[in-house]
Swiss-Prot record:
Name of the molecule in the record: MFS transporter fmqE
GO biological process, one term: fumiquinazoline C biosynthetic process
Family affiliation: Belongs to the major facilitator superfamily. Sugar transporter (TC 2.A.1.1) family.
Lineage: superkingdom: Eukaryota
Protein source organism: Aspergillus fumigatus (strain ATCC MYA-4609 / CBS 101355 / FGSC A1100 / Af293)
Membrane-related topology note: Multi-pass membrane protein
PANTHER family in the cross-refs: PLASTIDIC GLUCOSE TRANSPORTER 4 (PTHR48022), SUGAR PERMEASE, PUTATIVE (AFU_ORTHOLOGUE AFUA_6G12040)-RELATED (PTHR48022:SF33)
Length: 534
């Protein structure tokens, strides 16, 4: 049985009629691919997954470099404000205590404008990617990153720093929209989840590296310390440029623009397989886009996201991305500053945080082995349950002021970050590209990151007002607020979030068009397959 499935993928026969593929051949191909286990898919697509091979760079390097850029920027942007050298350069003097501090208005602006920059970058990336392609959009963003990083490194005023942070925020928002779209475009069904999870892995790994670099310079009082932290982003911009010139353009983009010869050439570079296999996969893309066009107008526009069954898809994607902030991710990402305010030693806080990020990498690798079996929807709901329990525990520990309680809060917050990478944030980054239709995927992903960035801006802005002593003064009891919001998200998710694991684009399209309840997507697909004889 396993050998038969692999053979079906590697040597499936095509029915050629003037370079066309009939629907039965496509259906047989997709069903053979969906029925494979993850290990069988790895064997069948081993060229894509051998990292030392030239062809795998085509599939993986662009999304992974985009994720690495995102991971490094998000943490360096937030944790650098805790560096004494940074505070000495951009802080103000508290004459009553004789100490330096960062004015609240500027810390809020740096955080919020970075998030809004991400939203703007996602919007622009969606517009450009549908006109000039995924690759050239990535090149444009990399050039913008070089300029933005230059402004950061040579900033002499808070306003100049704000401009640089906003520009780089736009870069990372756009790159993540491009990276996830590209991965979803080119990945085989059974490897789609693993590759999207790998994007999460690279992002989390770079967050840990970023925190480690900040930790290495935390006691360095020279301005050069924070300049180095920001300047490293030049390396990531260069990697994006290299990756963009190594990879082929998305074959989905080429087919959507009628460039069929280029689409087949891109598929050959990506998969390097037999003519029969490439002909079937090319036919599957053409068929999927044709079916979507039958339901919609020929031209692709932002307005289509809010029409018919696409509206429910857009609402679902936006809800999932917004929820990652609503359940407390901003509270967790501010844990370094928060834990310092409750009395923990600054180096201890950084060390625990670094350990937490690399624990997150282990959780992501666990996801590679288990996500297809567990399913996206079930894992998302489990993640919300775990988030609720941890937030309640953090809130309860807020009633104690002992050192042991403070350490327990630090450990739980970092474990929850790692668990969230696996079960909530990781699932969000995986499922949102899958919910999108082929034609609207880039637009959908841009909307996803716009909504996610707005949610991040909102909760990053209000969270300090919850726990700071000069406002809400909740301290760790802020966990109760996010526990309550998690319950709300879980209830809505039960009715709105679908299961997409193992489903093709056609399966998901059909489920939305038929008005199938999201929680029944998997069973509805099985029923349709049984009735059609596949």
């Amino acid at each position: 049985m396993p050998e038969d499935k692999v053979e079906a993928i590697e040597h499936v026969e095509s029915s050629r009629h003037d370079a066309t593929v009939n629907e039965k051949a496509i259906a047989d191909f997709l069903n053979a691919e969906k029925e494979m286990t993850t290990w069988q898919a790895v064997r069948a697509h081993r060229r894509l997954l051998l990292f030392a091979a030239y062809r795998v760079t085509h599939l993986a390097i662009l999304p992974f470099v985009c994720a690495s850029n995102y991971g490094y920027d998000t943490v360096s942007n937030g944790s650098s404000i805790a560096m004494p050298a940074f505070i000495m350069s951009f802080g103000a003097m508290n004459h009553a205590t004789g100490s330096m501090y960062l004015p609240s208005i500027w810390t809020s602006l740096w955080t919020s404008m970075t998030n809004l920059g991400q939203a703007l970058g996602s919007l622009i990336a969606g517009f450009l990617a549908e006109r000039i392609g995924r690759r050239w959009t990535a090149v444009s963003l990399a050039i913008l990153s070089i300029v933005g990083t230059f402004i950061l490194v040579f900033s002499s005023t808070r306003g100049m720093l704000l401009v640089g942070k906003t520009m780089n925020g736009a870069v990372v928002g756009g790159l993540m929209a491009i990276g996830t779209t590209y991965a979803a475009d080119v990945a085989p069904i059974k490897l789609r989840g693993a590759l999207l999870q790998a994007i999460v892995f690279f992002g989390v790994a770079m967050q840990g590296v970023s925190l480690g670099i900040v930790r290495a310079f935390i006691l360095d009082m020279r301005p050069l310390a924070w300049k180095i932290v920001f300047g490293i982003q030049w390396a990531f911009a260069t990697l994006v440029l290299i990756a963009a010139f190594l990879v082929p353009e998305s074959p989905v983009f080429y087919v959507a623009h009628g460039k069929h010869d280029k689409a087949q050439s891109a598929l050959r570079r990506l998969h390097g397989s037999s003519d029969q296999y490439l002909h079937i996969r090319y036919g599957a893309i053409v068929h999927a886009l044709d079916e979507e066009r039958k339901q919609q107008s020929e031209s692709v526009s932002w307005a289509e996201l809010f029409k018919g069954c696409n509206l429910k898809r857009t609402i679902t994607i936006g809800f999932i991305m917004f929820s990652t902030s609503a359940i407390g991710v901003p509270f967790l990402t501010q844990n370094i500053y928060f834990l310092i305010t409750v009395g923990l030693n600054v180096t201890s806080v950084f060390d625990i945080g670094i350990g937490g990020f690399f624990l997150g990498c282990l959780f992501v690798m666990l996801g590679w082995l288990s996500n297809e079996g567990i399913g996206r929807r079930r894992l998302w709901l489990w993640g919300l349950i775990g988030n609720f329990l941890c937030m309640v525990t953090i809130g309860a520990l807020g009633f104690s002021t002992t050192k042991a309680s403070q350490l327990a809060i630090a450990v739980i917050m970092n474990v929850l970050i790692s668990y969230g990478v696996y079960a909530t944030v990781g699932v969000a980054w995986t499922i949102c590209p899958e919910i999108s239709s082929h034609r609207l995927r880039q637009y959908s992903q841009s909307v996803a990151f716009i909504v996610g960035a707005v949610g991040g801006w909102l909760f990053n802005f209000i969270t300090p007002y919850m726990y700071n002593v000069d406002s809400g003064n909740l301290g760790a009891k802020t966990g109760f607020v996010y526990a309550g919001l998690t319950v709300v998200v879980a209830v809505i998710s039960w009715f709105l979030v679908p299961e997409t694991a193992g489903l093709s684009v056609e399966d998901i399209d059909r489920a939305y068009e038929m008005g199938t309840a999201p929680r029944h997507f998997k069973s509805a697909k099985a029923t349709v397959s049984a009735e059609s004889g596949h």
